[in-house]
């Protein structure tokens, strides 16, 4: 709402709207901006100027928090607006949401990538001992867990590490040593953030990237958990380790979009509009 350059008259742009389902990215744009009162006032004034008393926000936890702030600010200034939050996050980490649009396609990408990288890894197993595939996900391991979807028999992944289960580095190294001795190579999938059994983060000193305006670490711009583990495995076990970090490819590769995810996104949009028409007052 802060940038009106993306406004579309749906009555005149049906072909454009239909093409969006197969287009990477978000036409409406995205933001990591920390919302302040000035932003809330700007949004409210733009809504009033447009004669609008309704707002649909699409996104994850940050978006939902901003929408809650918007409702409170409008009410405090004497305006009754209707606000709906439509879930959309590849991390699938919204409380109360079973599956958010975006997650299915990210899961499909990761499962396909792990399957195909594993085949390449096996071809190079004469000089690569360990492959570490780092996924997006922030504080949740849904994307990493999806790496098993195309697993067959003893194929990758051999080990999956998610933030929901704290990692004991000593035990992990012993498991890697054991699996390598047994099969000659180990394929590990790790979430971009992992909790350590000692109460900290795995490779915390390697998470040296910047933070966004909300104070959250931008893991994809740091040296990363995967690289930390690769270095650790090499230095302590003497096993040559490679770290793969596809990062934003997981949410941008249009050829990996899952059809159920596409359908879910459309249904979520329709449900948001339907819910908006059924709301009666501020805060609903």
Predicted feature descriptions by range:
Residues 1, 32-33, 60-61, 86-92, ...:
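Short, ordered loop/turn segments at secondary-structure junctions
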Residues 2-53, 62-63, 101, 108, ...:
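Glycine-rich oxoanion-binding loops at beta->alpha junctions
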Residues 19-30, 88-98, 127-128, 210-212:
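Gly-rich Lys/Arg/Thr-decorated short loops/hinges at beta-loop-alpha junctions or inter-strand turns
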Residues 47-48, 80-83:
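Signature of multi-pass transmembrane helix bundles
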Residues 54-59, 65-80, 100-242:
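Accessory alpha-helical/coil subdomains and C-terminal extensions
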Residues 95-107, 256-259:
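Short beta-strand elements at the ligand-binding edges of bilobed clamshell
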Residues 236-284:
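C-terminal active-site/capping subdomain that shapes the small-molecule cofactor and substrate pocket
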